């Protein structure tokens, strides 16, 4: 009896921690789920930020990932079609920090916030064994670009 009551009471908590991922595209949901598992496996802190801040992941035609600043991350179709799981994971890590800043009301300035988010992403990539060199190079490049603005 107690186990049924406990299950009923805890079930909404379980549901609230799930990120909604639409089942569209050619295996996109699976790729995003794999990326989330990579984050969980190699950086539990960043995984917790992602699951605390992001409630939904959508897909868009922009050439870069973005967020609504509230709880939704929009991944570029181009990134999903490329199929690099670590690239998808890096986007999720980066954008979840933007959401956290937005929810906290931080007014860091756009360029400074990008530097922090790319450093956060870079830190994640350094935790992933055999992370693609081009992902690390891109994060370093973006840190340089946004640092000099």
Functional labels for PLM-detected ranges:
Residues 110-145:
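Post-HExxH zinc-binding segment in Zn-dependent metallohydrolases
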Residues 90-103:
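Active-site recognition of the HExxH zinc-binding catalytic motif
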Residues 32-36, 90, 118-121:
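Extracytoplasmic/secreted envelope proteins and their assembly/folding machinery
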Residues 4-14:
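Sec-dependent N-terminal signal peptides
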Residues 105-108:
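Flexible, surface-exposed loop/gating regions in the mature catalytic domains
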Residues 75-92:
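Short pre-active-site segment immediately N-terminal to the catalytic Zn-binding motif
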Residues 18-73, 77-80:
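Auxiliary, metal-adjacent structural segments of Zn-dependent hydrolase domains
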């Amino acid at each position: 009896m107690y186990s049924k009551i406990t299950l009923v009471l805890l079930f909404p908590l379980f549901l609230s921690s799930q990120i909604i991922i639409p089942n569209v595209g050619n295996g996109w949901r699976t790729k995003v789920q794999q990326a989330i598992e990579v984050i969980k496996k190699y950086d539990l802190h960043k995984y917790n930020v992602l699951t605390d801040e992001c409630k939904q992941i959508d897909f868009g035609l922009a050439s870069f990932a973005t967020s609504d600043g509230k709880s939704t991350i929009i991944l570029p179709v181009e990134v999903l079609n490329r199929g690099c799981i670590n690239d998808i994971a890096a986007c999720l890590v980066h954008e979840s920090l933007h959401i956290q800043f937005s929810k906290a009301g931080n007014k860091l300035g756009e360029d400074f916030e990008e530097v922090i988010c790319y450093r956060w992403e870079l830190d994640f990539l350094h935790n992933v064994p055999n992370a693609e060199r081009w992902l690390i190079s891109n994060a370093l490049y973006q840190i340089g670009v946004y640092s000099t603005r």
